[in-house]
């Protein structure tokens, strides 16, 4: 499954009443595709999936597939902590025409490694789509062990993982012990270059909303052997990568887009907009790019 080097974990635009704004989404998609994005993740965590209804998610899948019109792969966030519900949503995503699904590790109910294995296996067996796993223990509490990820990689259509554990030893083990066509993506913008250095494919990114073209240049320099230049770009981008997570995601990146002249609306409760100090800090970092 080739979804490129930079897959943007796309925000969901809202109007002034908090409804999904599809006109703003159309504008956002075109903007992202012109600024370094190789593929789009729809209705993931950055897309505020916890506060989107099932109907809204399906509408987002359908609209994005139609709007993208084959220009880049579309990845649907269909994971949850309910296996049956994930299967249902995955089937709806497949009907909508997406190219891949992303499945987050089950949150809150804290399954065992065997439970997570069976969960992902059950969903993968119900779809013909490629599956990208998503390990983000900082949000889910339960962490997918590298041994479990390696075992899951044996399932034919489980073909990638977004790794946001921050554990480079575990990530290296996954890369070393899975097939060459099983791709490991960084789930943390700031670890993109280190994960490339141990054999990773790229990043599922939030920062690419703002600095996608710069990130593409960093990856290009690295893959062309210009590692010192790649390191300099990494150092330049690290402040904005960190700033975008100083408040709960995606409030900072939505504000950053607004500061760049792209109105995408606010966030849904229980998330709240940035306060004035946070906004000023973000604006200062952006002005130095």
From Swiss-Prot:
It is an enzyme of class 4 (lyase). One of its GO terms (biological process) is lysine biosynthetic process via diaminopimelate. Its EC number is 4.3.3.7. Coiled coil: none annotated. The active site is at 134 (proton donor/acceptor), 162 (schiff-base intermediate with substrate). PROSITE patterns: DHDPS_1, DHDPS_2. Its main location: cytoplasm. Keywords: Amino-acid biosynthesis, Cytoplasm, Diaminopimelate biosynthesis, Lyase, Lysine biosynthesis, Schiff base. GO terms for molecular function: 4-hydroxy-tetrahydrodipicolinate synthase activity. It is found in: Cytoplasm. The record marks 45, 108 as: Part of a proton relay during catalysis. It catalyses: L-aspartate 4-semialdehyde + pyruvate = (2S,4S)-4-hydroxy-2,3,4,5-tetrahydrodipicolinate + H2O + H(+). Belongs to the DapA family. Homotetramer; dimer of dimers. PANTHER family: 4-HYDROXY-2-OXOGLUTARATE ALDOLASE, MITOCHONDRIAL, DIHYDRODIPICOLINATE SYNTHASE. Catalyzes the condensation of (S)-aspartate-beta-semialdehyde [(S)-ASA] and pyruvate to 4-hydroxy-tetrahydrodipicolinate (HTPA). This is 4-hydroxy-tetrahydrodipicolinate synthase.
């Amino acid at each position: 499954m080739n979804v490129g080097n930079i897959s943007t974990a796309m925000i969901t635009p809202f109007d002034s009443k908090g409804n999904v704004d599809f006109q703003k989404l159309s504008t956002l998609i075109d903007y992202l595709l012109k600024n370094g994005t190789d593929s789009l993740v729809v209705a993931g965590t950055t897309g505020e999936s916890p506060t989107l209804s099932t109907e809204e998610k399906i509408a987002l899948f359908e609209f994005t597939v139609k709007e993208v019109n084959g220009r880049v792969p579309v990845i649907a966030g269909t994971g949850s902590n309910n296996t049956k519900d994930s299967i249902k949503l995955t089937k709806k995503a497949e009907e909508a025409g997406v190219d891949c699904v992303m499945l987050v590790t089950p949150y809150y109910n804290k399954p065992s490694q065997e439970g997570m294995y069976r969960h992902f296996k059950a969903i993968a067996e119900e779809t013909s789509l490629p599956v990208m796993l998503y390990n983000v223990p900082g949000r889910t509490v339960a962490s997918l062990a590298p041994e479990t990820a390696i075992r899951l990689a044996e399932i034919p259509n489980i073909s990638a993982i977004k790794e946001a554990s921050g554990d480079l030893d575990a990530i290296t083990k996954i890369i070393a012990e899975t097939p060459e066509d099983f791709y490991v993506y960084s789930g943390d913008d700031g670890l993109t270059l280190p994960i490339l250095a141990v054999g990773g494919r790229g990043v599922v990114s939030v920062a690419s909303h703002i600095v996608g073209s710069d990130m593409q240049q960093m990856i290009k320099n690295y893959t062309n052997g210009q590692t010192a230049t790649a390191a300099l770009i990494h150092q330049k981008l690290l402040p904005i990568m960190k700033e975008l997570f100083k408040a709960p995601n995606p409030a900072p990146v939505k504000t950053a887009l607004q500061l760049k002249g792209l109105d995408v609306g606010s966030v849904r409760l229980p998330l709240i907009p940035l306060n004035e100090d946070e906004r000023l800090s973000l604006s200062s970092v952006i002005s130095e790019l």
